[in-house]
């Protein structure tokens, strides 16, 4: 085999290996950030939902809560939306669902944001994450990859950080684990 042929075979293999190495490293970093949030108190935050109500950590104390981060241009967010809708509609009275949309800080066009919210058809409040909110979560070294679902106990401690596309069963299991 000529040197040119060997080089032509070797370079693509190196590039593929580098790609998988980098993506694995990024995934591991994000997973570490998510796990960093578990067993930590929910940061003190204030965000306004689309109906004008201001929500804070204090509104969640005494109830189980689910903070579901999503955005436009997120395929996994679209795929999981029916399961998330079903879960929020079946939620117990002691469970608060809040959807946190990150479009504003990502400079997504407002019409696309409106289209995404209409398509999702969530019945629980949708909060629009602002720079201050995102900075608060960055300071706490949390991940805001989307989709991500944080399940919080009645004392305000995060018990689960569920990364990526979630099934009804996975979220139900997390909620059941923080039943007490």
Question: Could you say what each language-model-derived stretch is?
Answer:
Residues 78-120, 131-137:
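Structural microenvironment flanking redox-active thiols in thiol-disulfide oxidoreductases
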Residues 16-19, 73-75, 101-106:
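Short histidine/acidic/glycine/proline-rich micro-motifs that form metal-
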Residues 42-43, 65, 146-147:
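Short loop/turn microsegments at loop-to-beta-strand junctions
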Residues 120-122, 129-177:
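Thiol/disulfide oxidoreductase modules built on the thioredoxin-like
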Residues 66-67, 97, 149:
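Hydrophobic beta-strand anchors of alpha/beta hydrolase catalytic cores
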Residues 1-44, 180:
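N-terminal targeting signals for export/organelle localization
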Residues 55-78:
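Short active-site neighborhood of thiol/selenol oxidoreductases, capturing the structured segment around
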């Amino acid at each position: 085999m000529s040197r040119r042929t060997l080089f032509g075979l070797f370079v693509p293999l190196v590039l593929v290996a580098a790609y998988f190495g980098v993506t694995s490293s990024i995934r591991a970093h994000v997973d570490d950030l998510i796990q960093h949030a578990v067993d930590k108190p929910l940061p003190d935050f204030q965000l306004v939902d689309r109906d004008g109500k201001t929500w804070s950590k204090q509104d969640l104390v005494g109830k189980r809560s689910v903070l579901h981060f999503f955005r436009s241009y997120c395929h996994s967010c679209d795929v999981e939306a029916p399961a998330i809708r079903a879960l929020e509609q079946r939620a117990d009275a002691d469970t608060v669902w809040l959807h946190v949309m990150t479009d504003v800080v990502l400079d997504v066009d407002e019409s696309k944001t409106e289209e995404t919210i209409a398509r999702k058809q969530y019945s629980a409040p949708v909060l629009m994450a602002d720079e201050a909110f995102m900075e608060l979560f960055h300071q706490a070294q949390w991940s805001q990859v989307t989709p991500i679902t944080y399940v919080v106990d009645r004392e305000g401690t995060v018990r689960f950080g569920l990364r990526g596309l979630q099934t009804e069963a996975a979220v139900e299991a997390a909620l059941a684990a923080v039943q007490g």
